[in-house]
Amino acid sequence: YTEMNTKLIGREKEALKLEQCLNSQRSEFVAVYGRRRVGKTFLVRSVCNDSFAFYVTGMYNASKQEQLINFAAAFQRCFKTEEIKVESSWILAFNSLARRLEQLPEGRKIIFIDELPWMDKAKSGFIPALENFWNSWAALRDDVKLIVCGSATSWMISNLINSKGGLHGRLTHRVLVEPFSLYDCERYFTHFG
């Protein structure tokens, strides 16, 4: 638990677990989940020091096409490409992401997908594409840190943690972020006044 994360009051165990994943010598697939407004995104951004190779946040109540446009805009922002290229499917979007990540210098590549459940629309092909991205590319490397986050706890549990499909047993770590205890609330308000 590093000095730069001392602002994470009440999240010491969660921060330590994320740091261990970031510093491991293998690819990691981490699910961070818990109720809305408990600090999941802040935790990930703080521990990772905002040093993401790719970072996208799913859009609430958006269509598959809108989600793909959002993914393409994040791609352009992260990789500073000239134009936004919107892929027609999630398979193609994740393939483009893998190709671009392969062009980066050696070293860990942190991919943060926030509000992941919002990206999975009925018949969108999102989960099979994510499975393919992890199983056929990221898991075969030793430098990918795929961190997914979501407030839809039941979705995270059924589709990732207890997955019966292609992601069965693929998560390397899961981090449950719970609301502050009274003790942590007291520490927080004492520290930040």
Label each region the model flagged.
Residues Y1-G193:
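Phosphate-binding site recognition
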